[in-house]
C-alpha cells in the first residue's frame, strides 16, 4: 500500500480510460484486484492458467490458456501487465462485435500471418474441447474437433483455399453467430 509503484498514476488511469471501456473507478477496482493477485504487477502464464483451471475444473485448460495468454501479452515479454490485462478484458467483455471478432481472429491466427489455417483452427478447437472436458454435450455433427473445424470451414471458407482471411471470418460469423459463440467462449451477455 505504501509503495509508489503499486498505485496507478493519474496519467496511467487517463490512458486506460482512453483505450478501454472502463470508468476510472472500475479501472482502480480492477487494478486493486490485479495487484492483490500479482503483487509484482506481472501475471505469468502459470498464474493465468490457474485462473482458467478455476473456471474449467472438469477439463484441461492449459493449452487454451496458453493461446489466450499469448494474445493478452501484447509486447511478448512473457508477462501480462495490468495495462495489457485490462485492454484485453475490455475488448472481450465490452467491445463491439467487430472488436471481439478481431481479437478472436488474433487468437486463432497462431503464427500471426493474417490467415487462419485448418491446422491452426484445429489446434484451438482441440484446446477448447480439452478445456470443457465432458461438461458439455455436443451434437453428433460437432462431437470432435475435426468435425467442428470442417463445419466452420464449410461455412466460412468462401474461396475454398483452406485458410480464412479476417474478411471471411467476419462474414462467416455474421452469417452463423453460433460459430463465433462456440469459438470465443466470451460472455456475450456483457456485450
UniProtKB/Swiss-Prot annotation:
Record's superkingdom?
A: Eukaryota
Subcellular localization: Perikaryon; Cell projection; Cell projection, Growth cone
- According to the Swiss-Prot or TrEMBL entry, at which residues is a lipid covalently attached (N-myristoyl glycine)? 2
GO BP term, example? nervous system development
Matches recorded under PROSITE patterns: EF_HAND_1 (PS00018), EF_HAND_2 (PS50222)
Described by its record, this protein's role is as follows:
Neuronal calcium sensor, regulator of G protein-coupled receptor phosphorylation in a calcium dependent manner. Regulates neurite extension and branching by activity-dependent Ca(2+) influx in growth cones.
- Which family does the similarity line name? Belongs to the recoverin family.
Please give the name of this protein: Neuronal calcium sensor 1
Lineage start: Eukaryota, Metazoa, Spiralia, Lophotrochozoa, Mollusca
